[in-house]
């Protein structure tokens, strides 16, 4: 009987050919991307759990994932895995009475590019989830998310800006804020001794 999907069979055959360099490249990439799982503490952490990120909706709690700065380059993939697991758990319709959830992604640039973060910022709002992304400046945000960097700002419920030390960030938010002339009234009362 003839194969109904010859194109698929040919593509798959390229991976099963022992002389194929493609399968070696795929395996090499997978091993590199999963190397953080070799760390004994991470393996132990991931081996079992009594926690479900869905509990963020039903119980008042705060969850912290902290990786020392000197370990971020090695374990950012682990942080990405945890953030993705959280997104997956919260991407279901909330039940009546479920709490709102705030996910604070401080130093989000350390996670590198995550397509799911771009989608989650817009989509999870409908599931009672707010994502608060913290970047150092617009250059950092744009270098990671390229042409999609403004999605973070346009989908944000609130944008906070502190100490703009680079010109691009200062100009961007100055233009967004527009012109405003304010007035203030003050009243002082003074008394002098001996009156």
What are these regions (language model features)?
Residues 1-130, 144, 154, 165:
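P-loop NTPase motor domains
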């Amino acid at each position: 009987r003839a194969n109904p999907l010859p194109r698929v069979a040919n593509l798959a055959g390229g991976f099963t050919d022992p002389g194929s360099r493609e399968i070696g490249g795929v395996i090499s990439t997978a091993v590199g991307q999963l190397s953080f799982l070799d760390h004994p503490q991470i393996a132990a952490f991931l081996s079992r759990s009594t926690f479900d990120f869905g509990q963020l909706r039903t119980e008042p709690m705060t969850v912290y994932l902290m990786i020392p700065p000197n370990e971020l380059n090695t374990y950012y993939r682990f942080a990405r895995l945890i953030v993705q697991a959280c997104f997956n758990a919260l991407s279901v319709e909330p039940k009546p009475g479920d709490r709102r959830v705030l996910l604070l992604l401080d130093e989000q640039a350390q996670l590198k590019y995550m397509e799911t973060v771009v989608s989650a910022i817009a989509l999870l709002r409908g599931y009672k989830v707010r994502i608060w992304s913290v970047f150092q400046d617009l250059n950092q945000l744009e270098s990671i998310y390229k042409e999609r960097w403004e999605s973070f700002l346009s989908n944000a419920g609130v944008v906070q800006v502190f100490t703009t030390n680079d010109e691009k960030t200062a100009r961007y938010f100055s233009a967004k804020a527009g012109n405003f002339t304010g007035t203030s009234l003050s009243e002082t009362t003074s008394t002098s001794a001996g009156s």
